[in-house]
């Protein structure tokens, strides 16, 4: 490349930068034209690096100024408000000023309009806003939709708004901050529709209705009008401010560890309360606005399928995102209480899990049942043939074992006396034994996707996927390769480490002596175990002798949520299961992420696991390598401890209330085999995995269960 070419390239690039700011150049003196006036063209002197512009010849042959045309940047197409839509439906309406009250600095105008023989009034701080509210009331009178936008859609008119709400323009202007918010110029822009820390969730927060009972429980739901796209380049706070000016946002709470704070903001729109959470007040405020837009105006800002909640097949007592965010906050809040606001050395963790119980339609009455942490399994040399060591200290597994303690306590409460029966979550079943009361539901929270099939294919937050540099469009496709052989495979955890590996075809049986001689002790992944719970229930084999199968109503992830991968891991891969015993089913719970995704926990995973069950005074800390506490004592969650609880309940339950007749159990293993229907369901599950080509379930050496009850 010669020198002349280089100079041309340099001048060309400089010219582009300069042209970009031509309109913003201030006049240097009185002879220099201002913005929009004629701009003198360069003659090339003075060492200017800009490229010469072609001169235009006047009639006398002299050069003249070429007028710079100012480009108009088209603004976003806004959705038509009620006033505009009513005018299209009923042109020529007359609005009358009825009254003006209030002080000069804060007047209140009342306007009226007559439509179809009815007079509608609206009030506001300006005549324009008063007319708008009157028009909204008029629209509601003859259109069966809750707001103007839905009325517009119902009458066959569509809003053609070409938007890209994930563009870089969707950041907050400083003018919309509350007084207590200070914009951080170094923060990257967040994108509506992502699921990471700097972004919005799958469907945002969705508010609780003013009524405690969802309409879907009492009457058939009305058809939901199709959502319309939002104006481009505008964030939820800006959009809501245009639709409902003057709203006040309230700061509710602040929680979380120092590196992963969570703030909660609220706003009231049309008498309904909405809240949102985020890693700063700005994001929390935006999510509260997003919630209001979704509920009041049917304006959904994120339609990415893989980040949407996967609804359950059963009765849905709660709005999905409200439930997910509430469960997350409750578990994190309880863990904070148990660890002195995360200051305890045992607050260190990679994964946090918990079980929350709801007893009705209001999530405000939800109760944390268990909290746990952990990411490791026992070393083979520490196996116990007396049931005194915990094999698997992964957080979600420990949370479920803690839940078993609670279920035993509730059964004992029922068996105490008639007064306590009302307090218990159990009631007698007409089919024999006991069952949960109708409104009782359990929800599993895990701070990240469970190890195994659910996590292996979603290692990053969705916001990082599908990014195209030319369009800045954040798109996250569904699983591109759903039929690959690796999808759905059974996987086992690595002994004394982290991560999982696929099962071997010949590794379904482990031997006690083989493990003691150095063979790796294999433990099924958390994804596989949760899939198992979705068939045989979370109560396990021993409790199934007393109670009907119990299933999780929802599984909520704090991060790395991907609807396609999670639903496959939890139940889709075994949809071929058949011939299950009565009352057993393939459970399909609600699957959801949370609005404010948990921050990644950096650093090495601790070697301990923490557990707590409601009623416990303090947490229990277990060495994951040995399966016991640091003093070598067995855990309150070990097989032997839970078998003692089972024996105690068995001694109290009248024989006619047993779902399975068992007289004198001798060993832990025999007691488990007595739960015949449970064992049949488990066998069908293992067969379903094999038939689907996903591998064989690997069980622990049978010697682990050959122990008897010793008080």
From Swiss-Prot:
GO BP, one annotated term: spinal cord ventral commissure morphogenesis
Region feature (Disordered): 1-78, 176-220
Biased composition (Basic residues): 63-73
Entry-linked SMART domains: ADEAMc, DSRM
Entry's EC annotation: 3.5.4.37
Listed cofactors: 1D-myo-inositol hexakisphosphate
Record keywords: Hydrolase, Metal-binding, mRNA processing, Nucleus, Phosphoprotein, Repeat, RNA-binding, Zinc
Cell membrane keyword on record: no
Catalytic activity: adenosine in double-stranded RNA + H2O + H(+) = inosine in double-stranded RNA + NH4(+)
Biased composition (Low complexity): 192-213
Domain called A to I editase: residue spans: 370-707
Entry superkingdom: Eukaryota
Residues engaged in binding 1D-myo-inositol hexakisphosphate: 400-401, 529, 532, 639, 672, 682, 700
Subunit structure: Homodimer. Homodimerization is essential for its catalytic activity. Can form heterodimers with isoform 5 of ADAR/ADAR1.
Known function: Catalyzes the hydrolytic deamination of adenosine to inosine in double-stranded RNA (dsRNA) referred to as A-to-I RNA editing.
Protein name per UniProt: Double-stranded RNA-specific editase 1
Source organism: Mus musculus (Mouse)
High-level lineage: Eukaryota, Metazoa, Chordata, Craniata, Vertebrata
Gene, per the UniProt record: Adarb1
